[in-house]
Structures are given as structure tokens and as C-alpha cells.
């Protein structure tokens, strides 16, 4: 039906007859001529309908926005004075010689010229996706996926599918469960990742595997998470952590170069502890120049328990952020930041304005200055490299509270005061994560997942002091977003059992949940390592948006529902009966609805 896309037309096609299919983006009557901006997925071109073409002109008079049409016409170059430099096709127009209305359109429930509510956009997503902004994002996503496949194919990786109906295993989030009709009372789980299957593929001899795969996690949502998401899953045998990072970094740098013409350069490598200490986060945004500076040694002897208490506690921390030009912050603004850090458990936010750096103690203004002497203030100014016009913000509490509160405050200050340079890209690797982390009750949990190898110790050494062990894990971070994470895997059955034991998984449970893995590890398992990227998050960054819903064709809401199809919905009672399932909650809700009526 078509010979060209609207957005591909240019001067090289002058005089040629083309056939186009698409939608009416806009129609205008000017001086007896009808002008149509015709749109398809590749762009917009201007069509001119002359009244001398009577049949075409009569049909063109009937056109309204979003009519689906087919058009035949001749490409002609616009006069220089009429060139539209805002359009990719602005040097040409089409003189219509034929027109067919394929389908008419009712008045749209969305207004493409205004901001529509998120709810309306998701409910009528098929219309929202017609907008060039959205269309461009979905096309860029397709290009990113195509690039990944091409790169990995060229580097001897095999695209291998893994099961979607599988066994529930503890990976940190709740599983989506699928009931079995054949095995009544039993359930499959939708995979949170293909983790165990890709490890089994390494044991099968497929030493370079990849898959662009759907994964599912029943967890609380936020702007960069969805219940179903797409992962670029990669696993290798006989490669070190450094080699995995090298090849995946090469993939990302070449992707950015091809799709954005941006040179990311070589990624710096930062240890987990350094990232927390300097930036208050294991995914630091290095575009933001603010850093956390430890000052416990300076404040440990002051006569102010708020500072000296944590400064002398091995589980405490006292740190500051120096904000260039921050002395201009009003008391109201400081109070707002005090409320903000309270979200993270901080009990307050002490501050010190540097009104005159050369004057030392006499040149600072602070509600806590009376507790500090000249030497302490001088040391603080030197340690933070403060200058006239700056403000120093203090955090003093447990290590966790100070790190989280000041880390979040750092990001907020960078945004509010426009200190974060959004014109640049700052990637890095974060490595040497702790193997385990404690919950509020002192129990250990795997920081990544229980199949991650510890760094440089034996199973016996790990069992002695597991809380002190680091893992051979690594995350790729770009502009404050974790875009990929991976690790060297455990390839020894004894080590795997040791990790399970530390996590409180008893031998019987090990066999029931992971017996197949422990068995497979007995048969010449190669050393293996891998990494998984979040495709949605990568494309979100490539597109310059801050919400992954913008780069998914049909996303869910933050309540994990689809406004387009009204999923999830109540199941047919006959289907539930066939599955031997009784849904008590649904009955209660139904009773409430009936009583309300």
C-alpha cells in the first residue's frame, strides 16, 4: 500500500510519485488550497491538495485529525522562502494526486497539543503511542535491543531461551505464582530472573549465553520499576569478573556511541565502601559535585553530645556536606531540608554558614557554634575546603542513618540548587559489595543473591565471620542509576551449601528448593560469571526521561494494574474450580460491593 515513509522524504526524490499511508496530524484550509500534515511512525510531511484535483479535494475536505488515510502524490521541492527548518522533511512537500480514507476517527479522548493526565495516557495507550515523542522512544528501544543482539552475536554469545513457568526460589522479592491444573495444589512461579537456568547452561557447556527476557517481581513500584520488566541477561564461563566488566562496558560504550553519538570513556571503578563514604549511596551520581566528608575525629571531644556521642561510637558516624554558595539558603529552606532528612531517621540538621572564611571562628554563623572552639571550626573549614558564601550541613547519628540521610540530601541539593550537571554522562563500576547484610533482628541476608561467590576466601573462612566477607559482585552505574548488576557465581557444592547454612536454610530446605542445583554442582562445573542489565532503565536513560513507563509500550501503573485492559481481574469461577482454588478475599470484596449497592 505504500512506497515510502512520510519521514523519509527528501529532495533526492523530487519529481517521483510516492504512495504514503498514515494519519492526518493536522489539516488547514489556506487560500483555496488544503494543506495536510500527514504522519506515520517515521515522521511528518506536508501534503498540498489543489482544487483542480476535484475528487481528491472533495475527500480532503472531509478529513479530520487522526483519520487513517492512503495518499498518492508527487514529491516537489519547496521554494526557499517556504522551507520549514523545524521539520526533517521541511524542504519538500507532496502534491496530492490520489486520496483514500481508510478509516475515520471519532474525536480523540486525548489532546495531543496539551498535557494529558497519566491515567488518560495509560487508558488510551494506543493513542498516546501515536505521539511522535512516544513513538521515538519505542523506536529507540527497538534499536537498543537490536544493537545488543548484534553485539553479543558478534562476540560468540548464544541466544538461548529459559523457562517462564518455573520453581519458586528466594531471590529477594515476592513471586508471581501460577496454579497448576494438572498438579492440583501446586504452583509455578514466574521467574524473577533466569539466574539458576543460566548457571545450569554454563554447566551444560554453553560458555557464552545471553537472552533479552521478561522477568517478574511482585514488589512495591516506583518510577524506575515495573512488575514485569525486560532484562538483558548475560552469563559466561572461564571469564573473570574483570573480563565480564570489560566486555559489557564495551557493549554499553558502543551502544551510547551508535545511538547517541556520545563517548562515555573508560568507566572508573569504585569500591562499595568508598561509594557509601563519599556519596552516601552504592549508586552514586557523579554529575553532582557534592560529597560527604567525615569529621568525627574533629568533633569527638566537643561538649555537645549530639556530635561527640556518635563520634565516639564505633557504630556511629559524623559527616558533613559543604554546599558551595549555600550560605544564601534561608532559614525556611534549611527547615525544609531538616524535615527531609527526618524521612531517613535523622533527628536534625545542624548547619554552619561561612560568611567570611578569612575571619575563621568569627566569620561563621551557626546555632551550634557555641559548642565549638576556634580550633574545631578551623579544622572543619580546612577539612571541607569551605569558602566564603558556603554552608556546611552536619549529620550525626548511626552510620546507616547518616549515610542514608546525607546521601539523599546530597541528591536533593544537587537538584534544587542546579549543581548536578545534566549535560554530561558519568558512568562507573561499583565493586566489592558485602556478601551479606543484617536485617533489624540481626539475621543475615544475601546482599545480591545466594549464588554470588565470596571474594578471596574459602567456605571454612566464610563460616567463621560471614558478616565481614565481601562478594565478588559488581554493579554498573550511570548518572545515579544502577543499570546492571552481576557477580562471579559459586561453582562449588560445598561453598554453596555453606552460604545456604549462613542464610539459615537448613539441609532439608536446601534439597527441596535447590537440590537440582547442588546436584549439578557435583559434575565438573566450570567457573562462571555474568551480569544482567535492565533494558527498560537503559532505554530510559538513552531517551532522557526519568520514568520507565515512558519507554514501555504497555506499562502498568504504580498499583501494578493495566488501565487499558483492566488487568488484573477476577477469574471465572469455573476456572478456579478446575484449579481447585477458592478465593476468600475476592468473596469478601464482592460482598462489600453487593452491600454497597
Swiss-Prot record:
One of its GO terms (biological process) is aspartyl-tRNA aminoacylation. It is found in: Cytoplasm. Residues 195-198 are annotated as: Aspartate. The keyword tRNA processing does not apply. It comes from the Bacteria. SUPFAM superfamilies: Class II aaRS and biotin synthetases, GAD domain-like, Nucleic acid-binding proteins. It catalyses: tRNA(Asp) + L-aspartate + ATP = L-aspartyl-tRNA(Asp) + AMP + diphosphate. Belongs to the class-II aminoacyl-tRNA synthetase family. Type 1 subfamily. This is Aspartate--tRNA ligase. It comes from Photobacterium profundum (strain SS9).
Amino acid at each position: 500500500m505504500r512506497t515510502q515513509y512520510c519521514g523519509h522524504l527528501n529532495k533526492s526524490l523530487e519529481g517521483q510519485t510516492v504512495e504514503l499511508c498514515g494519519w492526518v496530524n493536522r489539516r488547514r484550509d489556506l487560500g483555496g488550497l488544503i494543506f495536510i500534515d500527514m504522519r506515520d511512525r517515521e515522521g511528518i510531511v506536508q501534503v498540498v491538495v489543489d482544487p483542480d484535483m476535484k475528487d481528491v479535494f472533495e475527500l480532503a475536505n472531509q478529513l479530520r485529525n487522526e483519520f487513517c488515510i492512503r495518499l498518492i502524490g508527487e514529491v516537489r521541492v519547496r521554494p526557499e522562502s517556504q522551507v520549514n527548518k523545524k521539520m526533517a522533511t521541511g524542504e519538500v512537500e507532496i502534491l496530492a494526486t490520489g486520496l483514500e480514507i481508510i478509516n475515520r476517527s471519532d474525536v480523540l479522548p486525548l489532546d495531543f497539543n496539551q498535557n494529558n493526565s497519566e491515567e488518560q495516557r495509560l487508558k488510551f495507550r494506543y493513542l498516546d503511542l501515536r505521539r511522535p515523542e512516544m513513538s521515538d522512544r519505542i523506536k529507540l528501544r527497538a534499536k537498543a535491543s537490536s544493537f545488543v543482539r548484534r553485539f553479543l552475536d558478534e562476540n560468540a554469545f548464544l541466544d538461548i531461551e529459559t523457562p517462564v513457568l518455573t520453581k519458586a526460589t528466594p531471590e529477594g522479592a515476592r513471586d508471581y505464582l501460577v496454579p497448576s491444573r494438572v498438579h492440583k495444589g501446586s504452583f509455578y512461579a514466574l521467574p524473577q530472573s533466569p539466574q539458576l537456568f543460566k548457571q545450569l547452561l554454563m554447566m551444560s557447556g554453553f560458555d557464552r549465553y545471553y537472552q533479552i527476557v521478561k522477568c517478574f517481581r511482585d514488589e512495591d513500584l516506583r518510577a524506575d520499576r515495573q512488575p514485569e520488566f525486560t532484562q538483558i541477561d548475560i552469563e559466561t564461563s572461564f571469564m573473570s569478573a574483570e573480563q565480564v566488566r570489560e566486555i559489557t562496558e564495551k557493549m554499553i560504550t558502543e551502544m551510547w556511541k551508535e545511538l547517541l553519538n556520545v563517548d562515555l570513556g573508560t568507566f572508573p571503578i569504585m569500591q562499595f565502601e568508598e561509594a557509601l563514604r563519599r556519596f552516601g549511596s552504592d549508586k552514586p551520581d557523579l554529575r553532582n559535585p557534592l560529597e560527604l566528608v567525615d569529621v568525627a575525629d574533629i568533633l569527638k571531644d566537643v561538649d555537645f553530645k549530639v556530635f561527640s556521642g556518635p563520634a565516639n561510637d564505633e557504630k556511629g558516624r559524623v559527616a558533613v556536606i559543604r554546599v558551595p554558595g549555600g550560605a544564601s539558603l534561608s532559614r525556611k529552606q534549611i527547615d525544609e531540608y531538616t524535615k527531609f532528612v527526618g524521612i531517613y531517621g535523622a533527628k536534625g540538621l545542624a548547619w554552619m554558614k561561612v560568611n567570611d572564611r578569612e575571619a575563621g571562628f568569627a566569620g561563621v554563623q551557626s546555632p551550634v557554634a557555641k559548642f565549638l572552639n576556634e580550633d574545631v571550626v578551623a579544622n572543619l573549614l580546612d577539612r571541607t575546603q569551605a569558602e566564603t558564601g558556603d554552608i556546611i550541613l552536619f549529620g550525626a547519628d548511626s552510620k546507616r542513618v547518616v549515610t542514608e540521610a546525607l546521601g539523599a540530601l546530597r541528591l536533593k541539593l544537587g537538584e534544587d540548587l542546579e549543581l548536578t550537571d545534566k549535560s554530561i554522562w558519568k558512568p562507573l563500576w561499583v565493586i566489592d559489595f558485602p556478601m551479606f547484610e543484617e536485617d533489624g533482628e540481626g539475621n543475615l541476608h544475601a546482599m545480591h543473591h545466594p549464588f554470588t561467590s565470596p571474594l578471596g576466601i574459602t567456605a571454612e573462612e566464610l563460616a567463621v565471620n560471614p558478616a565481614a566477607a565481601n562478594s565478588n559482585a559488581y554493579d554498573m552505574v550511570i548518572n545515579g542509576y544502577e543499570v546492571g548488576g552481576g557477580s562471579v557465581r559459586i561453582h562449588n557444592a560445598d561453598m554453596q551449601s555453606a552460604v545456604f547454612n549462613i542464610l539459615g536454610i537448613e539441609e532439608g530446605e536446601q534439597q527441596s528448593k535447590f537440590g537440582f542445583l547442588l546436584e549439578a554442582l557435583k559434575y565438573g562445573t566450570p567457573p562462571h560469571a555474568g551480569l544482567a542489565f535492565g533494558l527498560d532503565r537503559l532505554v530510559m536513560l538513552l531517551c532522557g526521561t526519568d520514568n520507565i513507563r515512558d519507554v514501555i509500550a504497555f506499562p502498568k501503573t504504580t498499583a501494578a494494574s493495566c488501565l487499558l485492559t483492566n488487568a488484573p481481574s477476577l477469574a471465572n469461577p469455573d476456572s478456579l474450580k478446575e484449579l481447585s482454588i477458592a478465593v476468600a478475599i475476592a468473596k469478601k470484596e464482592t460482598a462489600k460491593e453487593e452491600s454497597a449497592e
